[in-house]
Amino acid sequence: MAMSFFDQFASPSYLGIPLIAIAIALPWVLFPLPSLRWVNNRLITIQGWLINRFTNQLMLPLNTGGHKWALLLASLMVFLITINMLGLLPYTFTPTTQLSLNMGLAIPLWLATVIIGLRNQPTVALGDLLPEGTPLPLIPVLIIIETISLFIRPLALGVRLTANLTAGHLLIQLIATAVFVLLPMMPTVAILTATVLFLLTLLEVAVAMIQAYVFVLLLSLYLQENV
């Protein structure tokens, strides 16, 4: 039976047991543990420098109250980057191509930012639903539109991450299939196609990191509006 291109996004199972939990937990095993030595090795030093740079850029527009989220957002970005990068390896499963996982990350974090705004600044949070200077007849319509746009935010977060990764994986598989089909018939064309595949893989590595950064950056912008 011919396999579908979308079979790579199905959650693998062994003896009927879904392995998505192991796929999600595995990246944490790859993280280097802090060293007890006075001078850390190069890997930990580079990792710490990158996380500090990212945290400083992310927390720059936030006030002191938003700095409490620095560890959570930095950990989330590293986690997403690791999962996305591991998903580019052959014969691996990418959990972030599942909308259920991405929505499970987006909805609680978005809801937490909204609750913080309603608890700390209820007047300002509710005032964002109605722009200043709105004509009286348009007030009900604008409130409905702003409320809908507010609730669409977590959906946009999850769908953006899922769609970008899914499209990239499908394109890589299509071009890789073309390489195997063309290799015995037209080797020259197959080599050119393989070059395109290599360049596309490099692009997907960049997309995997950029999408994780965009996911966390949008969360920080939502947090900025509510702290």
From Swiss-Prot:
Reactions mediated catalytically: H(+)(in) = H(+)(out)
This protein's UniProt keywords: ATP synthesis, CF(0), Hydrogen ion transport, Ion transport, Membrane, Mitochondrion, Mitochondrion inner membrane, Transmembrane, Transmembrane helix, Transport
GO terms, molecular function: proton channel activity; proton-transporting ATP synthase activity, rotational mechanism
Localization, UniProt: Mitochondrion inner membrane
InterPro entries: ATP_synth_F0_asu, ATP_synth_F0_asu_AS, ATP_synth_F0_asu_bact/mt, F0_ATP_A_sf
Pfam families: ATP-synt_A
Assembly and binders: Component of the ATP synthase complex composed at least of ATP5F1A/subunit alpha, ATP5F1B/subunit beta, ATP5MC1/subunit c (homooctomer), MT-ATP6/subunit a, MT-ATP8/subunit 8, ATP5ME/subunit e, ATP5MF/subunit f, ATP5MG/subunit g, ATP5MK/subunit k, ATP5MJ/subunit j, ATP5F1C/subunit gamma, ATP5F1D/subunit delta, ATP5F1E/subunit epsilon, ATP5PF/subunit F6, ATP5PB/subunit b, ATP5PD/subunit d, ATP5PO/subunit OSCP.
Name assigned to this protein: ATP synthase F(0) complex subunit a
